[in-house]
């Protein structure tokens, strides 16, 4: 049986964590990015399908390729973030299922239903993006996830000729708390949940 994590860990992962828009000039090492993936890959996905593919943009050249896809409200915070992760999904993720889910012919579930394949890839890569955010927080990093961008431009600029399609962007770094907005409310249990 698992033990509950400490109240301090819960604060770090959830209640005190914030979405950041400003960043300190502290780099994020390649080793840290590898450590992030080493954590987030263990989050569950349907049939262990693991459809997310991540491009970590760290260079000025990479940010310039990304710039035309960004909405005006997301431009500055993305260009100044130490890292911007493009979380994409592989439309042919099922080709890896003989390795990832060897218990049966799971590949055929998706090759026979393109709609199921797309829904599964998008939904599960979104879950994996959430695992990446939690992994960042666990390692002392801050994040700024965004869906306000031109996905077609990102796909053309970074994934042309491949089976990858962009899902969302996540800025990663060490946040500047002086640039945080006042915390916004969340729905109560009664507003968001039901008991049957």
From Swiss-Prot:
Record's CDD domains?
RutE-like (cd02148)
Q: Which GO terms describe its biological process?
A: nitrogen utilization; uracil catabolic process
Its UniProt entry gives the catalysed reaction(s) as:
3-hydroxypropanoate + NADP(+) = 3-oxopropanoate + NADPH + H(+)
Q: Which UniProt keywords apply?
A: Flavoprotein, FMN, NAD, NADP, Oxidoreductase
Enzyme type, top EC level? oxidoreductase
Q: What induces it?
A: Up-regulated by the nitrogen regulatory protein C (NtrC also called GlnG) and repressed by RutR.
Necessary cofactors: FMN
Assigned EC number: 1.1.1.298
Against Gene3D superfamilies, the record matches this protein to: NADH Oxidase
Pfam families attached to this UniProt entry? Nitroreductase
Molecular function terms from GO: 3-hydroxypropionate dehydrogenase (NADP+) activity
Q: Entry's PANTHER family?
A: MALONIC SEMIALDEHYDE REDUCTASE RUTE-RELATED
Family to which the UniProt record says this protein belongs: Belongs to the nitroreductase family. HadB/RutE subfamily.
Q: What does this protein do?
A: May reduce toxic product malonic semialdehyde to 3-hydroxypropionic acid, which is excreted.
Among HAMAP family, the record links this protein to: Oxidoreductase_RutE_HadB
Q: What is this protein called?
A: Probable malonic semialdehyde reductase RutE
Q: Which gene encodes it?
A: rutE
